Amino acid sequence: MYVVLEGVDGAGKSTQVELLKDRFKNALFTKEPGGTRMGESLRRIALNENISELARAFLFLSDRAEHTESVIKPALKEKKLIISDRSLISGMAYSQFSSLELNLLATQSVLPAKIILLLIDKEGLKQRLSLKSLDKIENQGIEKLLHIQQKLKTHAYALQEKFGCEVLELDAKESVKNLHEKIAAFIKCAV
């Protein structure tokens, strides 16, 4: 089963992924972008080079295609539980050029069975971002991240409606422990 955690930077995805590693020791943990060696190189170029937004979108789509082919599909074939920090949902939400059609091509229509969506309000996001050094995306401001968060939600529910992906929407301001228990229960009900 393929499970993804989605949310803007600062929502707590990475914290939850680390906790899930202790809970689901036999699962394959991965991430997008950069879940393969080639993907790490593409991610580095996409995030650090001065390139057009269209070129950046295609680098991320290339990363997604490689990740699907070399990580996701083999693990699904082996009937493994796959837990990914981000997916095509982030790809579509963060890019102005990344369509569902292009992402379905890149993923060969391999979609997550379950989507965990961590949502955070403006105040919570401000507080969390103030505690860390900001990357290029985070430096675009709170309003930009809240706009991306709305797109994440829209894309997650569109996948639910069109393809039957299950969505668990959570308030990222809940305690780390409560979030972990809800996420683990959501994953377990199909494992």
Curated annotation (Swiss-Prot):
Classification via InterPro entries: P-loop_NTPase, Thymidylate_kin-like_dom, Thymidylate_kin_CS, Thymidylate_kinase
Catalytic reactions of this protein: dTMP + ATP = dTDP + ADP
Catalytic activity, EC: 2.7.4.9
Pfam families registered for this protein in UniProt: Thymidylate_kin (PF02223)
Gene3D superfamilies: P-loop containing nucleotide triphosphate hydrolases (3.40.50.300)
Molecular-function GO terms, alphabetical: ATP binding; dTMP kinase activity
Main enzyme class: transferase
UniProt keyword terms in alphabetical order: ATP-binding, Kinase, Nucleotide biosynthesis, Nucleotide-binding, Transferase
Organism domain of life: Bacteria
Protein residues bound to ATP: 7-14
GO CC term, one of those recorded: cytosol
A biological-process GO annotation: dTDP biosynthetic process
Family statement: Belongs to the thymidylate kinase family.
PANTHER family linked to this entry: THYMIDYLATE KINASE, UMP-CMP KINASE 2, MITOCHONDRIAL
Role summary: Phosphorylation of dTMP to form dTDP in both de novo and salvage pathways of dTTP synthesis.
Name the record gives this protein: Thymidylate kinase
Annotated source species: Helicobacter pylori (strain ATCC 700392 / 26695) (Campylobacter pylori)
